[in-house]
């Protein structure tokens, strides 16, 4: 998809902000994240070109052919902690004609999902927390630099603590891709 996005927009770098961004740091994990049919992304250097990605968006010929699609977003789609841009991770990809995907650090990704607080985000965060690849203390620190009100901060802290307790009390188990770390 990155190659197609680059061909359409002339851009060489895209920021990926949705659940698929977990694959930059953990490419062989989290089958739950691979269930998503869309890739939430925007052009890094010329965000105004992002709208052109509708050509490979939902119900496009690209979507019909490959079964997945681009979901053009912008930098305000997800509420992220201060400094997230400096923590972006290069997605290891091949066959993209030099087009790069820059993905959220897993901690920033989870914070954005704690803010959104949709059922699918709650499930995703629990899966990632249970895997042990994120640190609850770091998540709690990021809550303090996330641009949300104090009510949202309290809710986020409560969910992080709850998810940490669930992860700590669960026996060593495989994530949906069959990997074990605990």
Where are the language model's segments positioned?
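Compositionally biased terminal segments of proteins
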Residues: 1-182
């Amino acid at each position: 998809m990155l190659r197609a996005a680059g061909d359409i927009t002339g851009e060489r770098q895209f920021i990926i902000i949705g659940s698929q961004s977990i694959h930059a740091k953990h490419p062989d994990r989290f089958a739950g994240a691979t269930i998503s049919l869309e890739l939430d992304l925007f052009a890094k250097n010329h965000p105004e070109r992002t709208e052109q990605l509708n050509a490979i968006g939902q119900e496009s010929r690209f979507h019909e052919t490959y079964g997945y699609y681009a979901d053009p977003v912008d930098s305000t789609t997800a509420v992220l902690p201060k400094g997230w841009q400096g923590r972006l991770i290069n997605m290891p990809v091949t066959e993209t004609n030099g087009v790069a995907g820059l993905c959220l650090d897993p901690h920033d990704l989870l914070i954005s999902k704690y803010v959104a607080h949709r059922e699918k985000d709650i499930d995703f965060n629990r899966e990632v927390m249970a895997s042990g690849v994120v640190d609850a203390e770091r998540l709690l620190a990021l809550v303090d630099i996330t641009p949300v009100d104090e009510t949202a901060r309290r809710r986020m802290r409560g969910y992080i603590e709850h998810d940490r307790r669930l992860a700590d009390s669960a026996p060593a188990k495989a994530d949906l891709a069959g990997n074990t770390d605990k």
